[in-house]
Amino acid sequence: MKIAILGLSGSGKSTLAKQLGSFYHAPVLHLDAVHFLPGWVERVPGEEEQLVTSFLDTHSSWVMDGNYTKTCYARRLEEEDQIIVLAFNRFLCLWRVIRRWWANRGAVRDSSAPGCMEKIDAEFVWWVLYQGRTPARMAGYRQIARQYPEKFILIQNPRQLARFLSSGSYSQ
């Protein structure tokens, strides 16, 4: 099984990726961990592309979380069996980001790149509330739904996510 988890910051992409990776006994690739070097420095795009390509070439199943439309995006969407988009309310996402920061302050989450300490600042708050959910990004998700209707799953709130997980829909 090959699964993409796309969506908004703070919606729970990494948590869901770990759950599904465990269920399928599939490797999980957190694209944040590929995109960033220690200290939240962005990796050179060609190197990022090479790392993701190598991952895709060497695994027959996977769970991948993160958007990163410039990193093997078309190939990822084409190869994946399910494309799950988490599009929760902006204020819920912000609350979850704050809660995540509080729980992990001074530490590096396992879904982050080594040396990227959990942080929250005005720029990231702006990203969660506005920049990360632009009309263009939302239109991109709608385009994926049109292009891959048979494997597209939109989850808009925690209740829908709980229903999805309890229904076993992910195991089809």
Model-based region annotation:
Residues 5:
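Hydrophobic anchor at the beta1->P-loop junction of P-loop NTPases
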Residues 9:
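The conserved Walker
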Residues 18-61:
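Conserved substrate/cofactor phosphate-moiety recognition/catalytic segment
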Residues 2:
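Walker A (P-loop) ATP-phosphate-binding motif of ABC ATPase nucleotide-binding domains
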Residues 13:
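Conserved lysine of the Walker
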Residues 50-95:
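Glycine-rich phosphate-binding loop used to anchor ATP phosphates in small-molecule kinases
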Residues 23, 126-172:
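NTP-dependent small-molecule kinase module
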Residues 88-135:
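A glycine- and Lys/Arg-enriched "phosphate-lid" helix/loop adjacent to the NTP-binding pocket
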